[in-house]
Each structure stands twice: as C-alpha cells, then as structure tokens.
C-alpha cells in the first residue's frame, strides 16, 4: 500500500530509522569521518526557514562540506507563475530565502567555501537581463527554477538559451501540480538544447524512478521500485540530464527500496550529484532531521566503493559546475 508523507514527516521518519541503524554515530566521530573526503553541496539557500548566516555556515561545517552552491529565490511578484506571490521560488511560513543580491554578496564575502547561482521569475520582462547580470558576476548555475510554468514555455526556453550561452547548468524543481509542468514531455527540451546541462530535483523527479508510479499526486511513495521510470530513462538516454540527490525527496528515493537505490547509484554514478537542501541548524545524522546528513550517510551505506562516492560527492559537481 502506497503511503503519502509530507517532506517534514518523511525526514523525521527517515531520521528515526537511520539513527536506529549502523549509521547512527556520535557527534565527534561523524564530523571526523566527514573531514576525510571533499564534498560539494550543490543545493543550499541563505535565510532558509529563518536560519541565520552563522547557523547556516555551522550547519555546512558540521556536514563536512568543502564547497556550497547557494541557490537564490526569484523576486516576490504577484503573477500566476508565483502563485500570485505565494511562491516566488522559495517562500515558507518563516519568510523568503535570499534572492540574487543577498546570495551574491554572501558568497562574495565567503568566497573560499561558497559559490552562487542566478535566478529570476521566467515570465518577467527583465528575467534574462537579471539572470545574465549575475552570470557575468560569476554565477555557476541558473536556479533553482521553481515556478508555476510549463517547462517548455517561451520564458523557460529563453533561460535555457542563456544557460547555453554562458555554459552553466540549469537546476529545476519538479513538483506535480505546483512547479515546472510537463515532465513527461521534457525530453523535447533535452533534445532541443543538447548543450545545456539540466539537473532534475524534487518530488516529481524522484518519484518517477519507478516505472509503475502512476498517481503523480503522491510525492513521497514508499515500497519497492520497478526500474525504468521516466527519470531513469532521462538519465540513461540523454547525456545532458543530471540528478540532484538533495532534500527529503532524494532521501526517500534512496531509502524506500535500498536494493534498487544501490543499483541506481551505481548505474548513474556519473550523472548524480550530492546536494543537501535542508533547512535545519544541526547538520548531523544524530539530529534525525537533517536530510543532507542523512543523505550522506545513506549514500555511503549503499555504495561503499570510495571511487563512486567521490563522483557523487565531489567529482560530478566539480565537472558540471566547473568549479
């Protein structure tokens, strides 16, 4: 029977499970182990759920992150693409995550450990100038694109064209009924823009590892996975398609069927990239709420091969983001 959890509920349940297995470690040993290998985190935000700068820096340090890529929000505008201002890219009940300017200034001040992305509401008239302003300043990615638009709309395609011109990847949040519509026809964009590196993220991206996932409204399914879903095919068939392992959705994909997850990570070891996208202040597995830390632990458990781990945690990000 398929179950449907919210992101917060899932992470809490997964945290309890992981903390109760061999992955459970104390604070000292956890941090010590993570210092042994470099990790690039391709998915974080400033001001995420009211977490301040010092707390975010401490969180990344606790996870053992060498380099963090910060993804900005779009502007708070009252358009259909932002659900009339409710979701301009990243709004929660605690407020809005940092936009382009704030994210750029933070990364500039902490350039040793942080990089930044560029973002804009795609149907705003100045979307491309806004994005290109920050690409010229050194943004390494466009995204996270998290808007109520068709994936093949004119505005989105202009963004893909900018990504091609500046040779940066595009990171997209796929969520049925909310963000980036048309997942099943996205292959047309992959074919139209073969030089653009697209990175899939979030619930709809990860539920579709399963060939038999039919109810797209179920965002955190449990139980066995049948290989050959749309996501699996996109990664297999298109050299320019990559996957972001972050958040509760990525963690769910790894824990719901560990036998499948092991094979999936090995099969797509050159296409999957670690990200955290967690809003907690801990950064530790033992907290039970940090999806980023739980992701790291689960990946290490599933693929003990250090060469594959290095690809997932470091080399793929370094290559795709050119950092």
Q: For each predicted feature, which ranges?
A:
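Active-site environment of divalent metal-dependent phosphoester hydrolases
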Residues: 47-49, 75-78, 122-126, 149-152, ...
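Catalytic pocket-lining loop regions of alpha/beta-barrel enzymes
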Residues: 140-141, 153-274
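Short, flexible/disordered intra-domain loops and linkers
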Residues: 75-95, 207-225, 251-255, 282-290
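Active-site neighborhood of phospho(di)ester-bond hydrolases with catalytic His/Asp-centered motifs
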Residues: 40-42, 70-71, 117-119, 143, ...
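Mobile, glycine- and charge-enriched loop segments
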Residues: 32-49, 100-119, 239-242
């Amino acid at each position: 029977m398929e179950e449907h959890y919210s992101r917060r509920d899932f992470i809490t349940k997964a945290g309890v499970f992981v903390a109760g297995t061999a992955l459970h470690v104390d604070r000292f040993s956890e941090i010590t182990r993570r210092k042994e290998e470099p990790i690039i985190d391709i998915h974080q935000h400033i001001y995420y759920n009211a977490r301040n700068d010092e707390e975010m820096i401490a969180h990344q340090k606790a996870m053992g992150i060498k380099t963090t890529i910060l993804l900005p929000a779009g502007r708070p505008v009252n358009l259909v693409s932002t659900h009339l201002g409710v979701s301009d890219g990243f709004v929660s009940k605690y407020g809005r995550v940092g936009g382009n300017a704030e994210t750029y200034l933070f990364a500039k001040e902490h350039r040793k450990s942080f990089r930044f992305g560029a973002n804009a509401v795609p149907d705003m008239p100045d979307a491309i100038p806004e994005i290109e302003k920050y690409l010229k300043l050194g943004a390494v990615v466009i995204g996270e694109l998290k808007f109520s638009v068709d994936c093949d709309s004119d505005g989105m395609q202009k963004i893909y064209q900018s990504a091609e011109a500046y040779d940066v990847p595009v990171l997209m949040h796929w969520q049925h009924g909310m963000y980036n519509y048309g997942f099943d026809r996205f292959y047309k964009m992959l074919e139209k823009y073969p030089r653009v590196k697209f990175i899939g993220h979030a619930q709809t991206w990860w539920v579709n590892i399963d060939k038999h996932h039919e109810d797209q409204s179920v965002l955190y399914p449990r139980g066995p996975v049948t290989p050959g879903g749309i996501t699996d095919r996109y990664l297999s068939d298109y050299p320019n398609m990559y996957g972001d392992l972050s958040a509760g959705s990525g963690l769910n994909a790894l824990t719901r069927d560990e036998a499948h997850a092991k094979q999936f990570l090995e099969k797509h070891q050159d296409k999957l990239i670690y990200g955290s996208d967690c809003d907690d202040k801990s950064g530790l597995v033992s907290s039970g709420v940090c999806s980023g830390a739980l992701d790291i632990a689960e990946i290490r458990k599933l693929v003990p091969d250090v060469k594959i781990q290095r690809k997932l945690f470091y080399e793929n990000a370094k290559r795709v983001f050119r950092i």
